[in-house]
Amino acid sequence: MEHILHVEDESDIREVARIALEDVGGFKVETAGSGREALRKAEESLPDLVLLDVMMPGMDGPTTFQALRKCPATAAIPVIFMTAKVQSHEVDRYKAMGALGIVAKPFDPMTLADQVRGLWRREE
C-alpha cells in the first residue's frame, strides 16, 4: 500500500481527500495542515508521495516543496501539487521545479485516487 502525505490547510478538504484516497483509492494517508508540519512529518514517516496544496498561509506549497528537496531524507520523494488556479504557465513552473504534475481543485472524490495514480505512474 502506498503512503501519501497530504498537505492542505483547509480541514474539510483534507478530510474529503483522505476519505477519497483511503476508502476509494486504497492508499495509506497521513495529513498535515501546514508546510512546517509537512516537513516534520515527511522527515519522520518518509511517505512514498507528497500531495501538496499550493496556496497555504505561512509556508506555501512551492516553498515547502523546495524545503523538502533540500533535506537529504526527503529530497527524492515525489510531489504532486493541488491548486484551484490551474493555468498553463503555473503548471509548467511546478513541473520545472520537479513536481510530477497538478491536481485541480475542486477535485472529484471518486476520481482523485486515479488522478494521483496516473501522475505517479508517469514518473516510474
Features from the language model and the residues they span:
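Alpha4 helix (beta4-alpha4-beta5 surface) of REC/receiver domains from two-component response regulators
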Residues: 18, 63, 86-104, 110-114, ...
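Conserved phosphotransfer cores of two-component systems
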Residues: 43-45, 69-76, 97
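Helix N-cap/capping motif at the beta->alpha junctions
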Residues: 31-40, 61-63
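Active-site beta3 strand of CheY-like receiver
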Residues: 45-51
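Two-component/phosphorelay signaling modules centered on CheY-like receiver
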Residues: 11-30
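Receiver (REC) domain active-site loop signature in two-component systems and cognate sites
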Residues: 56
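Conserved acidic carboxylate
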Residues: 8
